[in-house]
Amino acid sequence: MRCLLLSSIALWSITGAYALDEEHRHGKELLQKMCARCHSVGRTSASPNRQAPPFRSFSETKLYDSDFLQRLQDGYSSIHPAMPTFRFNRDDAEAVLNYMKAIQEPPKPGRK
């Protein structure tokens, strides 16, 4: 019985880790489809549009605002006139946000 319990826990933890990886993959796919024309969506490379910040640099501003997830669902838009408004359902918004958090650059020295 104990072996069965330990096996179940191990399987559950592996499945949980895989689901998180799958969520990150889904978030990246959404960003590639909707945003990569202007923004860099990965851990490296410059954005195709020099005025569009790479998503890996958002930690200092947007990602940790308490309402960022809600703004992704309500329709995220920018003051930049060429940027279209995007609206995500809750699952997609969470996948996008969690992927973006996973690729963030370390904070710059002297900042929290």
Predicted feature residues:
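Bacterial N-terminal signal peptides
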Residues: 4-13
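Extracytoplasmic electron-transfer domains, predominantly the class I c-type cytochrome c fold
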Residues: 54-101
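Sec/Tat signal peptide C-region and signal peptidase I cleavage site
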Residues: 14-19
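Periplasmic/extracellular electron-transfer cofactor-ligation site
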Residues: 20-51, 74-79, 103-110
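A conserved short alpha-helix in the GNAT/GCN5 acetyltransferase fold that borders
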Residues: 10, 101-104
